[in-house]
Amino acid sequence: MRRDKKRSRKRVCSFCVDKIEQVDYKDVNRLRRYISERGKILPRRISGNCAHHQRQLTRAIKRARALALLPYTAE
C-alpha cells in the first residue's frame, strides 16, 4: 500500500520574520494564535516557529497563564 504524502510549503517563523528578539508574555493577542481551541500550546510542526522562538513562546504562554492573562483551559 502506498501512502500519498501531502506536500505543503515550509512555514516560516513569524517571530523571525517580524524580527522579534523576545516573546512578550503581555502580548496576549499574539500568544492566542499559538493556543488550540482546547487550550493546548500548538507544536512547532504546526505553528511553524523555529526552535528558539518556540521555547520562548512556551515560557511566555505558561507565564501569562500563571498571571491569569490567558486561561489554562478552553471556555
From Swiss-Prot:
Keywords: Ribonucleoprotein, Ribosomal protein, RNA-binding, rRNA-binding. GO terms for cellular component: cytosolic small ribosomal subunit. HAMAP family: Ribosomal_bS18. It comes from the Bacteria. Part of the 30S ribosomal subunit. Forms a tight heterodimer with protein bS6. Belongs to the bacterial ribosomal protein bS18 family. The keyword rRNA-binding applies. Signal peptide: none annotated. The keyword rRNA-binding applies. Binds as a heterodimer with protein bS6 to the central domain of the 16S rRNA, where it helps stabilize the platform of the 30S subunit. This is Small ribosomal subunit protein bS18. GO terms for molecular function: small ribosomal subunit rRNA binding; structural constituent of ribosome. GO terms for biological process: translation.
